[in-house]
């Protein structure tokens, strides 16, 4: 069975990668689908995000990376996928994602949404959090793959922050 994991992934985080890896254990193929959203200002171009995701998932044999326009359920039908994967961090994610799952079901009754609870260590993590930390000069090395951390530091014209040592 084919599953689609749609999102903006701007940037992809270790939390996203955790969901992808776990999805790969459940489905024959997982397509990580980057939404082309012209109305949203992005840190990285679509091409950069596709390359970042490909590099971050190269260890997974049953992952494809692509971009799409429009509705995720329409893209899923085009790819003959039966499932949309969504990660859940907190209760507010569930409310939003459940509403979207119900909406998608009215549009395409044959497509199911599968929710994967985020691993505890990533329950606070989002692309927005990563960008906010980086813009204020904090280290994001523990939140994204190393090659993406470097890309982020370049975007904000900053060098990689030095670790803060606990001094007593």
UniProtKB/Swiss-Prot annotation:
Pathway: Cofactor biosynthesis; coenzyme A biosynthesis; CoA from (R)-pantothenate: step 4/5. Its EC number is 2.7.7.3. ATP binds at residues 8-9, 16, 87-89, 97, 122-128. It is an enzyme of class 2 (transferase). One of its GO terms (biological process) is coenzyme A biosynthetic process. GO terms for cellular component: cytoplasm. One of its GO terms (molecular function) is ATP binding. The record marks 16 as: Transition state stabilizer. Reversibly transfers an adenylyl group from ATP to 4'-phosphopantetheine, yielding dephospho-CoA (dPCoA) and pyrophosphate. Homohexamer. This is Phosphopantetheine adenylyltransferase. It comes from Trichodesmium erythraeum (strain IMS101). The lineage of its organism: Bacteria, Bacillati, Cyanobacteriota, Cyanophyceae, Oscillatoriophycideae.
């Amino acid at each position: 069975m084919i599953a689609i994991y749609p999102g903006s992934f701007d940037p992809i985080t270790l939390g996203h990668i955790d969901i992808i890896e776990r999805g790969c254990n459940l489905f024959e193929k997982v397509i990580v689908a980057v939404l082309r959203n012209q109305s949203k200002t992005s840190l990285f171009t679509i091409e950069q995000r596709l390359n970042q995701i490909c590099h971050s998932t190269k260890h997974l044999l049953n992952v494809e990376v692509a971009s799409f326009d429009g509705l995720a359920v329409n893209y899923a039908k085009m790819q003959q996928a039966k499932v949309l994967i969504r990660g859940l961090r907190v209760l507010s994610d569930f409310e939003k994602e459940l509403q979207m799952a119900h909406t998608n079901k009215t549009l395409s009754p044959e497509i199911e949404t599968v929710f994967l609870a985020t691993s505890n260590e990533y329950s606070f993590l989002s692309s927005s959090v990563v960008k906010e930390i980086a813009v204020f000069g904090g280290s994001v090395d523990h939140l994204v793959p190393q090659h993406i951390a470097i890309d982020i530091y370049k975007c904000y014209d900053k060098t990689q922050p030095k670790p803060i040592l606990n001094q007593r």
